Amino acid sequence: MDVRADQHQYNPYRVFSRDQWAKLRDDAPMTLDAQEISALRSMHDRLDLQEVEEIYLPLSRLLSIYVASMQQLYVAQRRFLGIVDRKMPYIIGVAGSVAVGKSTTARVLQALLARWSPRPKVDLITTDGFLYPNAVLERQGIMQKKGFPESYDLPKLLAFLSDIKAGRRRVRAPVYSHLTYDIVPNSHITVDRPDILIVEGVNVLQTGKLPRDGKAVPVVSDFFDFSVYIDAEEPVLREWYVSRFLALRDTAFHDPRSYFHRYAPLSDEEATATALAIWERTNLANLEDNILPTRPRATLILKKGADHVVETVALRRL
């Protein structure tokens, strides 16, 4: 295949145009209908049959190859070591900025992978559940940095992923409410030995500081077998964030339980100014300082244009 010359920011990747990538679908069957695709789409994200056929079906086909190869390697390693071990799930990370469409991508992948033969068990979690409760963030003076690396209970998240990777049964993860903008007390989801686990979050590819004494310092991505970064230019992300904020002002913010209920009465001009201020103060800073620098660590990068559709795909060379 004639693949375009790598762009400097994507080295060491093979970069495919949308048309080139779409041809890699080969004979992968379409297993979702229009109604199912609509249900997977997040607010203001664009997802239709064509996007699934041209972008996500080729990715599903690629992942089937990666998963099968990992399973063969796992069996070979067990045979080499002479051990009997628990089944290890394949873990996929999905990263990218606020408002870029991570949740849609993660849900589409979950739906497509779960329809492989012989119907693997595919679970999905977001790292939002591992944010510290608002009371803790307020006490530490970092409420304005919610979503930054320091706002997560990293030891709890690492322990969760370690248990999953070890094949343990009924591993629990905290639940986060986007309505109340906080951890739901005494509420958990249970992940019970999936074949594939998708982990979605803004900072899942974040690295830690290198130790001076040579001791291992684990990071979330140490547990990933494959990772996807959803990319878009900053002005586009800003526009998407503002559009989403305005849409939520007209819907979810009207619920008295909403953390952002105070924004419901705002005019379009006031809501736009508020959204831009939040973007500049929190989301842009997090993007520039923490999220975007992790892009080169991804296995695959999906670059979106202003219309929300993927324009290029960059796949890390083996």
Curated annotation (Swiss-Prot):
<dbReference type="Pfam" id="PF00485">
    <property type="entry name" value="PRK"/>
</dbReference>
<keyword id="KW-0067">ATP-binding</keyword>
<keyword id="KW-0173">Coenzyme A biosynthesis</keyword>
<dbReference type="InterPro" id="IPR006083">
    <property type="entry name" value="PRK/URK"/>
</dbReference>
<keyword id="KW-0418">Kinase</keyword>
<dbReference type="GO" id="GO:0005524">
    <property type="term" value="F:ATP binding"/>
</dbReference>
<feature type="binding site">
    <location>
        <begin position="96"/>
        <end position="103"/>
    </location>
    <ligand>
        <name>ATP</name>
    </ligand>
</feature>
<comment type="similarity">
    <text>Belongs to the prokaryotic pantothenate kinase family.</text>
</comment>
<dbReference type="InterPro" id="IPR027417">
    <property type="entry name" value="P-loop_NTPase"/>
</dbReference>
<keyword id="KW-0547">Nucleotide-binding</keyword>
<dbReference type="GO" id="GO:0005737">
    <property type="term" value="C:cytoplasm"/>
</dbReference>
<dbReference type="InterPro" id="IPR004566">
    <property type="entry name" value="PanK"/>
</dbReference>
<comment type="pathway">
    <text>Cofactor biosynthesis; coenzyme A biosynthesis; CoA from (R)-pantothenate: step 1/5.</text>
</comment>
<dbReference type="GO" id="GO:0004594">
    <property type="term" value="F:pantothenate kinase activity"/>
</dbReference>
<protein>
    <recommendedName>
        <fullName>Pantothenate kinase</fullName>
        <ecNumber>2.7.1.33</ecNumber>
    </recommendedName>
</protein>
<keyword id="KW-0808">Transferase</keyword>
<dbReference type="GO" id="GO:0015937">
    <property type="term" value="P:coenzyme A biosynthetic process"/>
</dbReference>
<keyword id="KW-0963">Cytoplasm</keyword>
